[in-house]
Amino acid sequence: MYKRQPLSDALYELTDHNYCFVAHKEMDAERKNLGWGNDLARPYTYSAADQEVQMQLNDLDVLIAGSFPERQTKEYGKKAKLFFRYSERILKTGNPLLKYPKRFFHWHACNPPWRKAYMLCASAYTAGDYAKFGLFRGRCYKWGYFPETIRYPSIDDLIDRKAKATILWCGRFLGWKHPDDVIEVARRLHDAGCCFKIEMIGTGEMEQQLKRQASEAGLLETNIRFLGAMSPEAVRLHMESAGIC
């Protein structure tokens, strides 16, 4: 919800308030600590357990389904006149041959070819991943996150204010996001005699490993700073001042 609030606000108004956002589960503690989820109470937000929302789901026209229980997604998808799924890439860790048959049957069971469903791709790789299983070909659309749009008086002034040798990395410290590549980039820049500063925003399972690598390279605090978790608003301020994001 936190990534799609502006879009949800717009859909709520465009449909004359005939839009609802159904949350299957509460936001996890990690994201709440980042400041996400604050001020998200909206007249169109419901919990999946609410009886009122069950009535709306039984009389829907369009369904956009993300990380929702598959049994209920199938049930409501049959009732919808227009059915979209949205997804990030599904093969983040590759597609080993031994896992292919199981994945093929699972995703075809979730998305039978005779059901007219469309895919909203929240990654540049989503369409290609599903195409490997013969799914959603010709029925994929670009999708993404929808943060608030801020109109700056002058983009040129904003660029001029940026710190020229500052690099910002923001995300969860997970293996498939490869934050360790940033440490390697820093090491190469340092060896080349470059003057630079890298700020890393986020938390995750690789945090201690990354700090250790930065320390072993002699770059911790001097060239690389770990800023921890912060709210989306604070992240935007850092992005406004960084030369490279």
Functional labels for PLM-detected ranges:
Residues 47-49, 204-207, 224-238:
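Conserved active-site histidine-acidic residue motif and adjacent donor-binding/catalytic loop
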Residues 51-71, 84-85:
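Short N-terminal targeting/anchoring amphipathic segment
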Residues 114-162, 166:
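Donor nucleotide-sugar binding/catalytic pocket of nucleotide-sugar-dependent glycosyltransferases
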